[in-house]
């Protein structure tokens, strides 16, 4: 009897030791650099995050170092009109958010997130070099204006410039959908303590994005305006190289998720099988399934079907981001053009209008720590949720604040135009003596809107997407930015056409236009979007595959 008790005791001790050994390793299916289950103590978690944060910070500095002031480069250096420059910038930015679909498919189906980020970083860097050359080599950029005669870019000059820009767009397509998911992969979803840290990771990930954006909005824009575009584009190119190096330095600490096959193929199989069976009658002998048992295009697994259902439930939430992106895109285009016609001098120092974008990013740098350390613990007392607000609640708050931002922009423009009329500056197009710092609230509010909407969206699509489609769903979420930029470009084109002689957005002199009407139009679109989002959010059922 004693020997039996001893044997049971030994078995219990052995089982306890096995359980403790298992807890030493991540249990979410990830592997380390050697292909083994990753040891929690030496891989992933916050240990791996500094390298991912540094990579994202430097890459975003490079991207925004181009994007923040690109409209000024088109108008001043390439001698484009305001409308043409805005279209070029919005189309390029839209493409930067369409290419993530390519990167996501490659990551989920073939290379995994790590190698996708690595390979597309090389493409990105090549594009940065081409863009820098187009601004530095005399034969690759248009000659300076002689009086009112401004020569346009030649075919060769345009080819080099746009090749660089669209290589950057392709390169960012392999990074955008993968890096946030790759960072979240460093936290074991089966470990409750690591799940809580992952929610905080998304806040600080967005924080690091905006550190890069802040430097771009201040230092880089100032360099571009005062020291030229050669140096202004060279610095972002160097930082893109640093971003790639930082990512590789963290390799021994990373946890890797294996690619799980093409998610597009899986979705197509479900849709094709559903279509084939839509008109079929239920057979009397349910055991006679023919070749359906071996043909995935005729019979899919329950998991495949549930994954497609999840994607369909995400569509209304996804679509709400399109109008938000229309509003948010104005900080790179028409906010800048508005600021260009306002008083921008402090003594002898002239403020570049794109520099006001620093207040968009400054609001993020202020809001994220306050949200993560103050608001979340406070709200947690009332909601009982570890993360404070749900992802959908965060997104809804962001939509509302973005409308406030455009409302303030419309009011500022109304005052500016009235002042232009009072001082007889409408026809001359001279600077209106309204201080550019009146734009600060609209930039600050839009930055705060991003903290709520973008971070909520990143976390929502990561948590609610099937495991095999995480990169794809991240890219799908980013696609709303593309559609928002394209829609904004379309709205500008339609407004310019329909407003005729009384053009709301004139080619050269916005004192003679009605940019305020355009901003009020966007306020209306955003206001309609909010109740639609709330309706579908209430109906949404949270599920995991």
UniProtKB/Swiss-Prot annotation:
The modification Phosphothreonine is found at residue 116. GO terms for molecular function: transmembrane transporter activity. It is found in: Membrane. Expressed in roots. One of its GO terms (cellular component) is plant-type vacuole membrane. It is a multi-pass membrane protein. InterPro entries: MFS_trans_sf, POT_fam, PTR2_symporter_CS. Keywords: Membrane, Phosphoprotein, Transmembrane, Transmembrane helix, Transport. The chain crosses the membrane at residues 89-109, 117-137, 155-175, 201-221, 231-251, 315-335, 346-366, 395-415, 436-456, 475-495, 518-538. The keyword Membrane applies. It holds the Pfam family PTR2. Belongs to the major facilitator superfamily. Proton-dependent oligopeptide transporter (POT/PTR) (TC 2.A.17) family. This is Protein NRT1/ PTR FAMILY 8.4.
